[in-house]
């Protein structure tokens, strides 16, 4: 697929069948138990959401928001309806960022690691701050303990008068860009902090565990004189902590059996992953898992999945070395405490991401799906492992009854860039949950475990592809009455059309079963920016957005994907744009039943300074062009930053044109700012020259469907129901939604 075949129907089966065989083999091991998860809430928060923890009763979530220096609290008494509670400022003298939070076993206290603006030139020690959260609506500070420079993750061991915190003191010596200094002058360490006095005991004080000598003695350790502890997980049964030393490509095991004195047991190398012919190392707008590499695992998160067995999230954080060894393993690994690999995911996680539209080609040359998080919990009495991808915005769920043979249960979409994971397994009402904290968009996702299998959701079926089809960035939608068809935008190099088979939508699933590559008449690949598509009897019209006004095009292709005609706006209409060098964009196209008339949505009209989009009508037989103006709503908070535009147009048999109007809120614009995601109708007959159209609300996606995705971009009516899909920018949650009758 890197140099796509010019044959019009591209299944890629021949190119990728071998690469996907391990996914199929893994999938065949999933039928031993029926339990699975379903998303019950996607909750926007104010600011970012990074590390998340849950109270033991499973009724309250606490998450860190570093940019604001706060803890956020959310009431999840009813998981499907989270309620935001007042935030808590954790800064000291107005300075500091929370990097981690853990909840005591009785749920009384939140223990927070706070980094104090240390950097390459300022060695400021951090704090462990304790807050009383007995009443989550009235959180009270309790005590502060000074720890080392740059605390990162922490975890708790013991309870009551034996309670201690194990803190990863990273001291990454950040430079002006915020990047860690590798091989720095200030070695990190592991601090063990006594918290016994919270329950009337005598604190064991601060014990610092140095790592330099152990790393120097470890073959293959990277930057051994600069330990950088990252993440902590505790095996409560064996009283042992595993701490990832990410940049050092190692983990440390800490013995916590003595109630007042911790001991370094050993440091283990996390070694390398070797991928042969099943990775994508090129950022080229094509997804082809055909390359090879060797990568240092460089684990970020770690989690105990069974006594004596822990998982590593092989994110990678360094650079390619002189031998060509890359940072990151692009998957996860299970190790035992001897340092032996119990299980290695290899290519399976990335192959799974490709099939579900979550593979981030823009990260191919770096770290691929960038697995950052792992968490473990017992659901339905069975051990499970959760594996999250920061760049792909998904979680894989595995059963680990046998750590040597994890069983893939499912892949679930998350909000943009999941950073933290938490499990809830002991609620009084029996509900078991897991939660993701999604940093970039500022949201929490809640998923509920169903012991007999999650019920099908035909309103929001999961979209998957046949083996060998890479997909994403769906920017336009149409139908032939039997199938849906979608185009991706220029996230892919060669333009293409996907066919979506809706036969299984009642079972909560739709399948991309065919992809047609678009070519010029001479056989050369067509490389444009498709933003809309309309089905006609002898093929499709594609609306391509140009980088300038003159670059906007309507492109006719036949059923084989070969270009038949390319049409630009007439010069008289182009002259109406306030700035011809700035395209406000073709964003959708609709065709009349006879194919004689096209309607085109121009995202932001002719003048960016005016809150108006435009509709252009082209009567093909007479070559007559007509323009009308469409009034846009305005964002209530910041109309400039969260500008409004049209992203799709659909013509109904009753003569109404449906327009999908949206703001820039959601995604990188933060979920809490997703305000306008609406479908309006206008009468097609009213599209006359110079008219200002009157719009009528048909669907409010934000209000009625909690639609927090930024780019709601595709819309089509199939079997009487109006379907909407978002552009995931190439990787992430593709939300295909049946909104009902238009």
Where are these regions (language model features)?
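Gram-negative bacterial Sec-dependent N-terminal signal peptides
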Residues: 2-26
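Sequence/structural signature of beta-propeller domains
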Residues: 28-742
């Amino acid at each position: 697929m890197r140099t796509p075949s010019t044959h019009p129907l591209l299944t890629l089966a021949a190119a990728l069948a071998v690469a996907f065989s391990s996914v199929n083999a893994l999938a065949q091991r999933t039928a031993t138990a029926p339990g699975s998860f379903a998303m019950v809430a996607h909750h926007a928060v104010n600011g970012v959401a990074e590390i998340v923890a849950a109270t033991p009763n499973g009724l309250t979530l606490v998450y860190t928001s570093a940019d604001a220096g706060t803890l956020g609290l959310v009431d999840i008494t009813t998981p499907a309806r989270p309620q935001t509670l007042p935030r808590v400022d954790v800064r000291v003298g107005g300075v500091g960022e929370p990097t981690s939070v853990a909840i005591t076993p009785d749920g009384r206290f939140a223990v927070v690691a706070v980094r104090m603006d240390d950097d390459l030139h300022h060695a400021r020690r951090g704090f462990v701050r304790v807050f009383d959260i007995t009443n989550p609506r009235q959180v009270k500070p309790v005590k502060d303990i000074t720890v080392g420079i740059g605390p990162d993750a922490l975890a708790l061991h013991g309870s009551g008068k034996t309670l201690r915190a194990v803190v990863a003191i990273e001291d990454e010596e950040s430079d002006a860009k915020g990047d860690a200094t590798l091989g720095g002058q200030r070695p990190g360490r592991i601090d063990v902090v006594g918290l016994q006095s919270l329950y009337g005991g005598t604190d064991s004080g601060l014990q610092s565990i140095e790592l330099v000598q152990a790393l120097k003695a470890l073959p293959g350790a990277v930057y051994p004189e600069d330990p950088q502890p990252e993440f902590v997980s505790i095996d409560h049964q064996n009283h042992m902590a595993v701490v990832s030393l990410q940049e050092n490509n190692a983990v440390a095991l800490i013995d916590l059996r003595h109630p007042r004195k911790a001991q370094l047991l050993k440091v283990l190398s996390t070694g390398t992953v070797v991928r042969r012919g099943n990775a994508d190392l090129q950022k080229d707008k094509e997804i082809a898992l055909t390359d090879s590499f060797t990568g240092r695992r460089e684990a970020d998160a770690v989690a105990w999945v069974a006594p004596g067995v822990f998982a590593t999230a092989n994110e990678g954080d360094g650079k390619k070395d002189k031998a060509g060894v890359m940072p990151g393993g692009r998957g996860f690994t299970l190790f035992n405490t001897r340092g032996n690999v119990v299980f290695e995911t290899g290519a399976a996680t990335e192959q799974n991401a490709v099939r579900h539209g979550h593979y981030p080609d823009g990260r191919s040359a770096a770290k691929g799906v960038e697995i950052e998080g792992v968490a473990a919990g017992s659901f339905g009495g069975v051990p499970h492992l959760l594996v999250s991808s920061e760049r792909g915005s998904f979680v894989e769920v595995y059963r680990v009854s046998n750590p040597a043979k994890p069983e893939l249960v499912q892949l679930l979409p998350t909000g943009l860039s999941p950073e933290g994971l938490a499990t809830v397994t002991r609620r009084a009402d029996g509900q078991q949950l897991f939660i993701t904290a999604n940093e970039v968009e500022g949201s929490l996702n809640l998923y509920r475990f169903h012991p007999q299998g999650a019920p099908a959701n035909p309103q929001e079926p999961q979209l998957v592809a046949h083996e060998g089809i890479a997909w994403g960035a769906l920017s336009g939608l149409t139908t032939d009455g039997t199938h849906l068809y979608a185009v991706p935008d220029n996230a892919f190099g060669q333009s293409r059309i996907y066919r979506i088979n809706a036969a299984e939508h009642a079972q909560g699933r739709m399948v991309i079963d065919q992809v047609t590559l678009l070519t010029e008449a001479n056989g050369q690949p067509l490389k444009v920016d498709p933003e809309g598509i309309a089905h006609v009897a002898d093929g499709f019209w594609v609306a391509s957005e140009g980088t300038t006004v003159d670059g906007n095009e309507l492109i006719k292709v036949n059923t084989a994907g070969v270009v038949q005609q390319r049409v630009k706006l007439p010069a008289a209409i182009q002259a109406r744009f306030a700035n011809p060098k700035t395209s406000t964009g073709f964003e959708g196209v609709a065709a009349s039943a006879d194919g004689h008339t096209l309607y085109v949505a121009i995202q932001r009209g002719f003048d960016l300074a005016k809150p108006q989009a435009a509709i252009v009508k082209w009567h093909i037989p007479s070559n007559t062009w007509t323009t009308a103006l469409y009034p846009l709503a305005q964002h209530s908070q910041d109309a400039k930053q969260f500008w409004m535009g049209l992203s799709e147009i659909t013509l109904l048999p009753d003569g109404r044109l449906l327009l999908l109007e949206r703001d820039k809120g959601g995604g990188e614009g933060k979920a809490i700012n997703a305000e306008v995601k609406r479908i309006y109708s206008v009468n097609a007959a009213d599209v006359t020259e110079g008219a200002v159209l009157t719009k009528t609300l048909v669907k409010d996606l934000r209000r009625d469907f909690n639609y927090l995705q930024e780019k709601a971009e595709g819309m089509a009516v199939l079997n009487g129901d109006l379907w909407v899909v978002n552009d995931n920018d190439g990787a992430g949650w593709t939300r295909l939604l049946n909104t009902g009758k238009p």
